[in-house]
Curated annotation (Swiss-Prot):
One of its GO terms (cellular component) is mitochondrion. The chain crosses the membrane at residues 7-23, 41-61, 75-95, 99-119. This is Interferon alpha-inducible protein 6. Belongs to the IFI6/IFI27 family. Interferon-stimulated protein that plays an important role in innate immune response against a wide variety of viruses. Inhibits flavivirus replication by preventing the formation of virus-induced endoplasmic reticulum membrane invaginations, which are double-membrane vesicles that flaviviruses use for their replication. Plays a role in apoptosis, negatively regulating the intrinsinc apoptotic signaling pathway and TNFSF10-induced apoptosis. However, it has also been shown to have a pro-apoptotic activity. Modulates innate immune response mediated by RIGI by preventing its activation. Disulfide bonds: none annotated. One of its GO terms (molecular function) is molecular adaptor activity. Interacts with CIB1; the interaction is direct. Interacts with the chaperone BIP/HSPA5. Interacts with RIGI. Glycosylated. It is found in: Mitochondrion inner membrane.
Amino acid sequence: MRQKAVSLFLCYLLLYTCGCCEEEDEKRYSEENSDSSFWGMVTYMAVGGGLMAAALPMLGFASTGIAANSLASSLMSWSAVANGGGVPAGGLVATLQSLGASGGSALMAKIGAFLGYTVHKQVESRQKESKEKK
């Protein structure tokens, strides 16, 4: 269980750092095109939740097992080669397969919605900072 939590936390950190906006993105948003805070938040949460819920099956971690010729099968192969012929229990591939087999898409959707909310708050705070600088 601890390894699943660590894996999910690492995924969160990876996605959190990728969600930061650049200055060009700030310029793209103008005051006329900005949404209200609530609807903007709902949009980010829906997109984040939808993408994360679809991520496991799209990568090949399905409820029936790892799909052939998918990224999941490549990860499984690399993991087996790196660990002397077997996929380690509790490793990244095993954890993602467990989430895919047990309906972890609902959990991933919740994490994605939380990440969407976090990205929305970052975008909103950066917009406020850029307005204050002007």
